Amino acid sequence: MKAVLTRVSSASVTVGDEVVGSIDCPETGGLLALVGVGAADEPDAWETMVRKIAELRILDNEKSVSDVGAPVLLVSQFTLMGKTARGRRPSWSDAAAGGIAEPVMRRIATGLRERGIHVEEGRFGAMMKVASVNEGPFTVLVEC
């Protein structure tokens, strides 16, 4: 499992003409979390990802999402699992199938909400337009 976590002051996901998720957090900052679920992920990898998203101290003043009550926009992104070492076309063989990845994404969202974190989500499997106002810019790659 991989995630790209970007510190943002706002972010949104649009499917067609509908905004399906958005966060606006100019005071605290928030995170845009693009998450790719791998075919070979350990069964508890989602728990580690929840902990990382909630507790990494990557907001202003070395605070975490949990520390300041910052929101998270969670978006599934299987392309993070792409392999590009050979040839000119990425291989998606390391990405989990939709039937496996979708419940994992739901577990991550639920796990964050159980910690009291406000979570907005993209729409699994949809073609989405993701907009964000990056702060810093500050972006980290997390692998579980």
From Swiss-Prot:
Q: Which UniProt keywords apply?
A: Cytoplasm, Hydrolase, RNA-binding, tRNA-binding
One Gene Ontology cellular component term attached to this UniProt record is: cytoplasm
Q: Which domain of life is it from?
A: Bacteria
GO BP: any one term: D-amino acid catabolic process
Q: Which residues form the signal peptide?
A: none
Q: Gene3D superfamilies from the entry?
A: D-tyrosyl-tRNA(Tyr) deacylase
Reactions accelerated catalytically: glycyl-tRNA(Ala) + H2O = tRNA(Ala) + glycine + H(+); a D-aminoacyl-tRNA + H2O = a tRNA + a D-alpha-amino acid + H(+)
Among InterPro entries, the record links this protein to: Daa-tRNA_deacyls_DTD (IPR003732), DTD-like_sf (IPR023509)
Recorded hits in SUPFAM superfamilies, A to Z, give: DTD-like (SSF69500)
Role summary: An aminoacyl-tRNA editing enzyme that deacylates mischarged D-aminoacyl-tRNAs. Also deacylates mischarged glycyl-tRNA(Ala), protecting cells against glycine mischarging by AlaRS. Acts via tRNA-based rather than protein-based catalysis; rejects L-amino acids rather than detecting D-amino acids in the active site. By recycling D-aminoacyl-tRNA to D-amino acids and free tRNA molecules, this enzyme counteracts the toxicity associated with the formation of D-aminoacyl-tRNA entities in vivo and helps enforce protein L-homochirality.
Q: What is known of its domains?
A: A Gly-cisPro motif from one monomer fits into the active site of the other monomer to allow specific chiral rejection of L-amino acids.
Q: What is this protein called?
A: D-aminoacyl-tRNA deacylase
Biological source species = Corynebacterium efficiens (strain DSM 44549 / YS-314 / AJ 12310 / JCM 11189 / NBRC 100395)
Q: Which gene encodes it?
A: dtd
